UniProtKB/Swiss-Prot annotation:
NDH-1 shuttles electrons from an unknown electron donor, via FMN and iron-sulfur (Fe-S) centers, to quinones in the respiratory and/or the photosynthetic chain. The immediate electron acceptor for the enzyme in this species is believed to be plastoquinone. Couples the redox reaction to proton translocation, and thus conserves the redox energy in a proton gradient. Cyanobacterial NDH-1 also plays a role in inorganic carbon-concentration. InterPro entries: NADH-quinone_OxRdatse_su_L. The keyword Protease does not apply. It is a multi-pass membrane protein. NDH-1 can be composed of about 15 different subunits; different subcomplexes with different compositions have been identified which probably have different functions. This is NAD(P)H-quinone oxidoreductase subunit L.
Length: 77
C-alpha cells in the first residue's frame, strides 16, 4: 500500500481529477444554477453564487464563449 502513495501515476491521476473538477465540472454546474435561478435568487444565495464565481473564475472563462446567459425577451421587434 505504501508504494501506491509514492507512485507518480497516482499523483498524476489525483491532479487530473482535481483540475477536471475545478475547470470543468463545478463551472458547468454553476452556469446551470445561475441560468435557472437568476431572477428568483434571494440576497444570500446571490452572495454565495458571486463568491463561487470569484472562486471558479478560470473555469467560467473557459466556457463563457460558448454559453449564453442573456435573458429571453418577449420575441417582439
Amino acid at each position: 500500500m505504501e508504494s501506491f502513495f509514492n507512485n507518480t501515476f497516482a499523483t498524476l491521476i489525483a491532479y487530473i481529477g482535481i483540475i477536471f473538477t475545478y475547470l470543468l465540472v463545478i463551472p458547468l454546474l454553476l452556469f446551470y444554477w445561475m441560468n435557472n435561478r437568476w431572477n428568483i435568487m434571494g440576497k444570500f444565495e446571490r452572495l454565495g453564487i458571486y463568491g463561487l464565481v470569484f472562486l471558479f473564475f478560470p473555469g467560467l472563462i473557459l466556457f463563457s464563449p460558448f454559453l449564453n446567459l442573456r435573458l429571453k425577451g418577449s420575441g417582439k421587434g
